[in-house]
């Protein structure tokens, strides 16, 4: 599969194909579960509506994130990861020399509490360092963890928030095509579209739905399901006039947890397709492969 050949646009007739939408207000848990399974098998992505996360909470979280990226560079760089640090947290700016990704981003561990490092929380805007932002983040985390457990379980997972900032640009690609290392990602965005997914040899736009949560299946759930659920290939497209932002929450196994095909999903007629590895080893191998490519 040569993804690069179709990096810019799919035929207009295909762009109208809709990403699955799952309505969590449906009183039938069986129907909701069926919809999640079907979307995960066929697409590896779906949009959740009526998910229970208050729209006002999502708005407040986005407002504070936008304010941070509008600060002077010196303010943002005050929470940059030190050069000798192994942390994945902090502010990261785009590298004009590499041009593989055209976004700035800010990363926070948000769950469990023992993983949170406030050294990477900005002092400005004031809502970031005060009780306001922390309370909003805690409330949002509670909602997201509850939502994740409702969809797939995973009470022992780790949660990482990544805020992506794509300023207006004539560049076509904001983030190149990739699948996520994690188990799954729960993403919200501002009103500027740009997320695309690859299916049936074409790229499809993900429709913006106000207050929806986009769920993307990652590598670990794909491996645990022995390939039954797709780890969706996706990318981000820039807008020439408007700033696009997104707030994915990455749901990850603990670093030392061994992840591989579940025994109940394998057998003589369906042998394991993937090697069982600790999540840490998997991430290391994938990073090495990405760097080589």
From Swiss-Prot:
Record EC number: 1.14.20.6
Catalytic activity field: a (2R,3R)-dihydroflavonol + 2-oxoglutarate + O2 = a flavonol + succinate + CO2 + H2O
Keyword entries, A-Z: Iron, Metal-binding, Oxidoreductase
Amino acids binding 2-oxoglutarate: 164-166, 244-246
Cofactor(s) listed in the protein's UniProt record: Fe(2+)
Residues binding Fe cation, per UniProt: 178, 180, 234
EC class: oxidoreductase
Coiled-coil regions, chain positions: none
Pathway: Secondary metabolite biosynthesis; flavonoid biosynthesis
Domain Fe2OG dioxygenase as annotated: residue spans: 156-253
Domain of life: Eukaryota
Pfam families per UniProt: 2OG-FeII_Oxy, DIOX_N
SUPFAM superfamilies: Clavaminate synthase-like
Cofactor binding notes: Binds 1 Fe(2+) ion per subunit.
GO molecular function, one term: metal ion binding
Family stated for the protein in its record: Belongs to the iron/ascorbate-dependent oxidoreductase family.
Record's protein name: Probable flavonol synthase 6
Organism of provenance: Arabidopsis thaliana
Lineage: Eukaryota, Viridiplantae, Streptophyta, Embryophyta, Tracheophyta
């Amino acid at each position: 599969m040569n993804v690069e050949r179709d990096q810019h646009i799919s035929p207009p007739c295909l762009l109208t194909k809709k990403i699955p939408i799952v309505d969590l207000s449906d009183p039938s848990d069986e129907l909701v579960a069926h919809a999640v399974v079907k979307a995960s098998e066929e697409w590896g992505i779906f949009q959740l509506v009526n998910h229970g996360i208050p729209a006002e909470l999502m708005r407040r979280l986005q407002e504070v994130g936008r304010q941070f990226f509008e600060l002077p560079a010196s303010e943002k760089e005050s929470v940059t990861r030190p050069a000798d640090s192994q942390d994945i947290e902090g502010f990261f700016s785009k590298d004009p020399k590499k041009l593989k990704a055209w976004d700035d981003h800010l990363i926070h561990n948000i769950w469990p509490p023992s993983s949170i490092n406030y050294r990477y929380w900005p002092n400005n805007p004031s809502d970031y360092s005060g009780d306001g932002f922390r309370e909003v983040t805690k409330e949002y985390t509670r909602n997201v963890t509850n939502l994740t457990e409702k969809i797939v379980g995973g009470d022992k997972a780790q949660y990482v928030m990544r805020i992506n900032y794509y300023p207006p640009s004539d560049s076509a690609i904001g983030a190149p095509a990739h699948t996520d290392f994690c188990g799954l990602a729960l993403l919200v965005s501002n009103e500027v579209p740009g997320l695309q997914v690859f299916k049936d040899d074409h790229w499809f736009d993900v429709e913006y739905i106000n207050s929806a949560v986009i769920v993307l299946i990652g590598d670990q759930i794909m491996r645990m399901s022995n390939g039954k659920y797709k780890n969706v290939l996706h990318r981000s497209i820039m807008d020439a006039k408007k700033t696009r932002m997104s707030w994915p929450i990455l749901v990850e196994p603990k670093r030392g947890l061994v992840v591989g095909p579940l025994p109940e999903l394998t057998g003589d007629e369906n042998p394991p397709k993937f090697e069982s590895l600790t999540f840490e080893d998997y991430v290391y191998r994938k990073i090495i492969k990405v760097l080589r490519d």
